[in-house]
Amino acid sequence: ANLAEMTNLSIPVPPGFTITTEVCNYYYDSDLNLPEDLDVQVNNALKQIEAILEKSFGDSDNPLLFSVRSGARESMPGMMETVLNIGLTSKTIPGLIAKTGNKRFVHDAYRRLIMMYADVVIEKAAGIDPKDGKGIRHQLEEILDSYKEKKGYSEDMDLSGDDWKTVSDKFKIRIKDQLDEEFPDDPYDQLWGGIKAVFKSWNGKRAINYRRFENIPDEWGTAVNVQAMVFGNTSKNSATGVAFTRNPATGENNFYGEWLQNAQGEDVVAGIRTPNPLNESTKTDSNKDDLSLESFLPEVYKQLNEVRTKLEQHYTDMQDIEFTIEEGRLWMLQT
């Protein structure tokens, strides 16, 4: 709903569509089956987005990628699942490399898809309990760590496109060995796997416990937001960030947040790299020498600041926002 509202406020939001909570309830009432006409509706929505962005889902030359996220009525931080980069396959990878001229970025995006998909769709949604408490994501991270050690790399940034390709291949072998399922190479299989996994996450253990604690009714269900991917990691002029429309600790009217150059959304919150301050006024002694978004991309920062004002006026409350900058173009992902 917030994404749709931002669109109505003429705030730049990547195009997408929502599968409603009614479908979630139908799914649980119908023995985990989706309504018969849903695939026609989804395909029509995909076509509309393809027309807006002039890209095609599953296309070998100019592929469109999607994220699948939950859209619960009440925010349930970290409880519900997300899968990014859906649509990367052996057929679309070469096209995206040709399009972006960035082999490293594409293979990095692909290994992220594999990690998230294995964790969210193949393991958690299927209700598989990890052996020795080590889930598939943990195992894949161990594979990556040992690969870096072998190569003498200290950070993810050190890996080349070929490195990420090798790591992805190792990931797929481990997934097959551990979970007895192939990582799907068809974009539609990936998409529907992601959609069903979000619905299933509504009844995951963590989500149920959280609802009990917060008094959120089970029958609300979750919606699924399917949204075109925009990338904060295609170039130096790309970035990703999170912000509060004012200081969350004091409520002071200061635009407050963090951003990472040439990074994808989850990097900011994952703690893998140290984010930079959003602007000059909120710098502290510890980050006073770091590059702020305000000084690096002043036009984009100005636009972001205008969005912040619009959102506060509209919602009459402090907002917590996520944004991505793709090749110098601002996109709002969440408020």
How would you describe each model-predicted region?
Residues 1-335:
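Nucleotide/phosphate-binding sheet-loop regions of phosphoryl- and nucleotidyl-transfer enzymes
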